Amino acid sequence: MAYTTLKNLGIKSPYKEKYDNFIGGKWVKPVDGRYFENITPISGKPFCEVARSNEKDIELALDAAHTAKDAWGKTSTTERANILLKIADVMEQNLEIISLAETIDNGK
């Protein structure tokens, strides 16, 4: 199937053609190796492929969350707040890329 690319739309793309799951701080291929096409309403064509996760992937994510919960629970509220503020700063620095992704995904 022909893919819609930002290049086809005259825009330089900061995005990958395929996205895996983000589990335990790293990108992980779906256990069954399956992906689905993310269709953009702009053209009705696939924009990228995204991991088609299932219960096995969810179990891996839950295991990672359970592993991280103890350390997070021991983190002071001040340090947690600083981490969340850093996340907000990174999102703000990448607002154009995020809004472009939302536009492509939603068609407006």
Can you name each region flagged by the protein language model?
Residues 1-49, 82:
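Terminal low-complexity tails and localization/encapsulation signals of metabolic enzymes
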